[in-house]
Regions:
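Bacterial Sec-dependent N-terminal signal peptides
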Residues: 1-27
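Residue-level hotspots at or immediately adjacent to binding/recognition sites across diverse folds
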Residues: 24-344
Length: 344
């Protein structure tokens, strides 16, 4: 009898905890704003260390979960747009300047000084995004040059970069390119497995093994996929569960074909029953079922793997990222605006 009572009590307690957790609602809490920079680069190292990068050569860093921020203008790059950043700890980070010329810089002293590790003055060069797996292997992509998608990689933590040979680069269609919107149109995993989404007149998914069409809205330079999220259970191998978002940034309230999800690696794509509430520049898995997406007219949350999206904030953001090690989720956007997702 005593054993049965304990089992029943334990089951009731577990049910109460589950009901409490399901009742929690995500809320966007703005932490800081007012800086004259558009933030598109965001790297959340852990629950305390966050780096951001943006226009006017600006980089920001917090080491106390976003309570206070240190702002730095990179010396000699006052007008450069750093649209992506990858940070590894409170001292080490890499920033990507889009072009022309294109730059990649690295700091090892918390942003006090920066070393130029890559420069490309090729006409038409425009870097769009980069992604790292661990602290050594990384990949950067850029708009097509002579119809060949630009790709370079590093195996030493960004100290040196090796460009892919032209004959190994994927061929882009006329009017097909990438959006330097949030640094999340590329996802990299172990064994150099990658996922890249394009936009413009044609929108496709490029992987290390295939190229497939995307059903997202496309056909003009303002349309197409902006971001891809690939679910990973922690082994850094990725999975077949993916979500793609985008739309038309010239019609930021349009919900027409702005989001699709797949559970078979992109062989088939499904449209959400309730799509995000407009153009979205970034999407991020929070866990297997919960996702966050943001754009010019607000933030959406999905708790069923991307099948339905709830508009939880009308605050504008370019990018949202979850901590590499931890559970904290941050967002960044125009006018130096940075926010944190909290559960109420």
């Amino acid at each position: 009898m005593n054993s049965l009572f304990k089992k029943v009590t334990s089951s009731i307690f577990f049910l109460i905890i589950m009901l409490w957790a399901s009742a929690q609602q995500p809320e966007v809490q703005v932490l800081t704003s007012g800086t004259k920079t558009s933030l598109r680069g965001l790297s959340v190292v852990n629950d305390n260390i966050i780096w951001v990068s943006g226009s006017r050569g600006m980089v920001g860093k917090s080491t106390n979960a976003g309570k206070t921020w240190k702002w730095m203008k990179v010396n000699g790059f006052d007008t450069t747009e750093f649209r992506d950043i990858e940070a590894f700890d409170g001292n080490t980070a890499i920033i990507m300047g889009v072009g022309e010329p294109a730059y990649i810089l690295k700091t090892s002293d918390g942003g006090d000084s920066w070393k130029l590790v890559y420069e490309n003055k090729t006409k038409g060069m425009f870097l769009d995004a980069m992604h790292f797996i661990g602290s050594n292997m990384g990949m950067v992509i850029g708009d097509p040059i002579d119809k060949k998608i630009y790709i370079a990689e590093t195996m030493d933590g960004g100290d040196t970069w090796k460009e892919w040979p032209v004959d190994k680069r994927p061929v882009a269609d006329s009017g097909e390119a990438f959006f330097a919107a949030s640094g999340t149109n590329i996802r990299l995993f172990r064994d150099k497995k990658f996922y890249i989404v394009s936009g413009g007149t044609r929108s496709r998914l490029f992987t290390s093994s295939a190229i497939t069409e995307l059903p997202i809205v496309q056909g003009t330079e303002s349309t197409g996929a902006n971001s891809i999220a690939v679910y990973d259970d922690g082994d850094l191998k990725g999975s077949k569960r993916m979500v793609v978002v985008g739309g038309d940034f010239s019609a930021d309230s349009s919900r027409v074909k702005n989001c699709f999800y797949t559970s078979d690696g992109g062989k088939t794509w499904k449209k959400p029953a309730t799509p995000p509430h407009g153009y979205r520049s970034c999407v991020e898995y929070l866990d297997k079922n919960n996702l966050l997406s943001c754009g010019l007219n607000g933030v959406d949350h999905s708790k069923d793997g991307g099948k339905n999206w709830e508009w939880i904030s009308k605050e504008s953001f370019h990018v949202c990222r979850i901590a590499k090690s931890g559970v904290a989720i941050f967002l960044a956007g125009n006018n130096g605006k940075i926010a944190k997702l909290v559960w109420k």
